From Swiss-Prot:
This is Putative ferric transport system permease protein FbpB 1. It is a multi-pass membrane protein. Keywords: Cell inner membrane, Cell membrane, Ion transport, Iron, Iron transport, Membrane, Repeat, Transmembrane, Transmembrane helix, Transport. It is found in: Cell inner membrane. One of its GO terms (cellular component) is plasma membrane. The lineage of its organism: Bacteria, Pseudomonadati, Pseudomonadota, Gammaproteobacteria, Pasteurellales. One of its GO terms (biological process) is iron ion transport. The keyword Ribonucleoprotein does not apply. Belongs to the binding-protein-dependent transport system permease family. FbpB subfamily. It comes from Haemophilus influenzae (strain ATCC 51907 / DSM 11121 / KW20 / Rd). The keyword Secreted does not apply. Residues 140-345, 431-632 form the ABC transmembrane type-1 domain. The complex is composed of two ATP-binding proteins (FbpC), two transmembrane proteins (FbpB) and a solute-binding protein (FbpA). Part of the ABC transporter complex FbpABC (TC 3.A.1.10.1) involved in Fe(3+) ions import. Probably responsible for the translocation of the substrate across the membrane.
Amino acid sequence: MGWASFNLTWAWFLPVIVYGALPLLRLPQQTQAKTELFLTALSVLFMFISATVYKISMGYSVIVLLVGYTALATLSLAKLKVMQGDKFIIASLLCIILLIFFFIVYPTLAIFVSMFYDGDTFAPQQVMRILTQSYIVRVITNSLFLSGFVGIVSTVFGLAFALYTTRIARRTAFIGKIFSILPIVTPPFVVGLGVTLMLGRSGYVTEFLSTNFGFSSHNWLYGFNGIAIAQILAFAPISFMILDGALKSVHPSIEEASYTLRANRYQTFYQIIFPLLRPALANSFLIVFIQSLADFSNPLVLGGSFDVIATQIYFYIAGSQLDYASASTLGSMLLIFSLAIFIIQYIWIGNRSYVTVSGKSYRGDVQELPNGLKYTIIGMLGFWVIFNMALYGSIFYGSFTVNWGVNYTLTLKNYAMLFGQGLSDGAWPSLINTLIYAGIAAPLTAFFGLLIAYIVVRKDFQGKKSLEFLTMLCFAVPGTVAGVSYILAFNNAPLYITGTGIIVIISMVMRDLPIGMRAAIAGLGQLDKSLDEASLSLKGSSWKTLCFIVLPLLKPALLSALVTSFVRAMTTVSAIIFLVTADTRVYRIYFKSCGRRRIRHCDCIRFYFNCCDDGNYFVFRLDCRRYAYFPF
């Protein structure tokens, strides 16, 4: 438990004795409840302040103490008739607040505070010293320029695919959807290394161009070019999903009205349809901008001498020269950029309405696009499909080759090397750890997401919007920043959990918590509140209402959250790469450690987990279609 030399930790349990003496004072119920609540808050503050001052690391027994304090606070608030005295709702709300504070707010504050410390010395001037270095300025400029370029190009491709599936295709729309969504379920590093197999120094496309056309620049891929190609492949599907929904919501009768007023197809598209897509286009650009800014895997594989913020933070932590101050400063800058864009998207775009029709009206038919635009879109989709087929074909074929780029002879030795050495060697330990961590994290994500959604949607209390915003903040915090903030926050007293499997699971849960929450909110929006009221009127508690009324009706939403969280937990890299050790290593870190020297082994792992991730995702889609529900 972390005993001090003078047993300070015994004092943490003394307030519990005081609670037993309070009834002897015969105070009024309201006064006694307020006194108990004050003592609880004071006890928790004393526990954490004393542990911080005396460097006492809390052990697992403190969890029992915190549960006890939470129960006492719940009883006190119930006596004060907070939330109508519903103990389950009060306890759930307290747990959620503690969860958000300790694993979102506290780590975020830790990374900002670390900016102003040089070791244990307070040095506020070092922030400006770091930010004014020419190298740091170049890294920040590179990141912003790359993110802007990828955001624009990904949005263009996403718009083209969305127009194809909604305005051009009749029987072939599924082809566009499959190849547009496939990169979403592709794990990190896969796209980057797949591009390397095709276009790198030993790539077959590079060899073909060199042999037949005298192409001599073999290093053109490593840098801005390679990162941009990989990120566009990875993030254009996100843009597609946003714009596909926006195009489907545009009412066709508007297009018919334009044609009846003698407008041609070019005028209808550029002056009617395109302006209605502006919020979706802006939303797409901002989201892709954040994703590109926070991307860690592709720049690490293809960056070369083109440094970006995410990878530079990693090198400051894991490189030969440990520099927490520079890592914290760059992490804070990355967080500020991401939060600024997230707030713009959340407030500005989220509050705008571009409704095209209200009430009941004639539906009309979708009109054809201009011929020039139509054939351009078909050409873009054809290029995208061929490139992706070559990319994933390279991954499959490369896993069976002796040595990619040198000897293309087929062999099974790569799989035998990884999976034929027993469960204690090769790739098995990392794979088993990954399955265990993801298997624990996914149900917790779905459960806490449902709990937050139920309280936010069904209950009214002060700070509800703030609670929802802080939960959604997990999406805005880049994975690299989250990993660094967890190291800074939990690598010392009072909460020392770095190097354990617990911190990996917590990171997975908190990163994916908004997925479970948004899926449950979407499902609860389809359920009438009268169902809850009927249950409560029949003397059913909130716990029973949630378990026996709401939960069975939210199976599709929970399934979507469960599967999506499991896939994301299996494929996450940027956050947990700072948190794993030799004993808690996951397969993505093992995959990274294979490196170029064993690239064929990487192909085996990539192919195996591509099959797992894609299978999970499409089974999830089929099951959701069975329930006629798909929230994304």
